[in-house]
Amino acid sequence: LVGSEMCIRDSFKGRQWPPGSMEEGDSRFLESVLAEVLAHLEPPKDGRIRHDVPPASLRKTTDLDLPLVGAGLDRVLSDIRTYLSQAVRTDQPGFMNPLWGGLTPEGLAGELVTAATNTSMYTYEIAPLASLIETAVLDRMRQHLRMPTGAGTLTTGGSNGNLMGVLCARQAAIPASGHDGFDGRSWCMFVSNEAHYSVAMAANVLGLGLANLIKVDTDGHGRMDPSALDHAIRREANMGRRPLCVVATSGTTVRGAFDSIDGIADVCETHGVWLHVDAAWGGSCLFSTTHRHLMDGVERADSVCWDAHKMMGLPLVCSAFIVKRAEVLRAACAHVNEAHYLFHDDAEERDLGRLSLQCGRRNDALKLFLSLIHI
């Protein structure tokens, strides 16, 4: 540790260590950066969203060699200009390739403040107001989901939210699995054949195995067929495999289909199976009086993931995972009990790190909080 600190100190020769208060010229530099960013956010004069430059050509026109001696802030500002000139204009209305895009001023402001305050969300001690803001945001999202009780956390995205949904399903079905492990070969999980690939990732990571991921037929509109789901669960049960969970999708990646949550929930209740809803894209329909019906029945789900950075146009990443039974999420994250140096009994109810798979975690709630204040 001492040797590492000496190396770091040496790299900061001529500057304050640890880096902290602004030095002379730093404020002017940041003002210049902000001016460049604001200029970049003006509509492109040629209307283009991206410049189709092959990697080899871009390498030739961009200095990517990292210097062995610091080149100073003027070089940094020059490189920022270069970066902005080649950036895909994800803030523009014409950017429609993925399921996210756009930019709101309050969202950008939240990102700037989050970066400037640079805290982590594991304990109230180090992120007091940020912890309360995240709790307030999650409470509002639960209200829209019509889940009066429960808990949640901000995650790294919908893929992480789906992973946590399956993890909580495993915890509910096999309470000792987090401590003892489990044999995934006797269990299976059900998804539509148009579900996001992150559900397969969850099956892989959690030890269920891709062979035990059962894909259920969809109708002509790309929605999971509840009767086909019921048949699949019964078929697998006859083969000696137990259902771990069902993942419904609210807004599929390719066709934007919304599964019938009510129909799927009926099947899950019949078989006593955990229902997770992947509402990464479609969750924001809950803010719409016109389109809310697409998610009818979501209050019957056991867990939900919801990406505010998609339909709401917030900067990446702003994604929530919400579970109806808080005790299941706490038990699924029991690994935090090993961190006695970080988490203490007297702060158990206010330390958000106890409900997360992450330790270091940025304050992604602020931009959503500011957005909800604005709209």
How would you name each of these model-derived features?
Residues 6, 156-159, 179, 183-248, ...:
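PLP-dependent aminotransferase-class I/II
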Residues 252, 271, 296-372:
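Active-site C-terminal subdomain of aminotransferase-like
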Residues 257-289:
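Catalytic PLP-binding core of fold-type I/II PLP enzymes
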Residues 9-149:
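N-terminal entrance/gating region of PLP-dependent enzymes' catalytic architecture
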Residues 134, 138, 150-180, 199-203:
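Conserved beta-loop-alpha segment that forms the PLP phosphate-binding cup at the N-terminus of a helix
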Residues 1-8:
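Short, small-residue-biased leader/transition segments that mark boundaries at the very start
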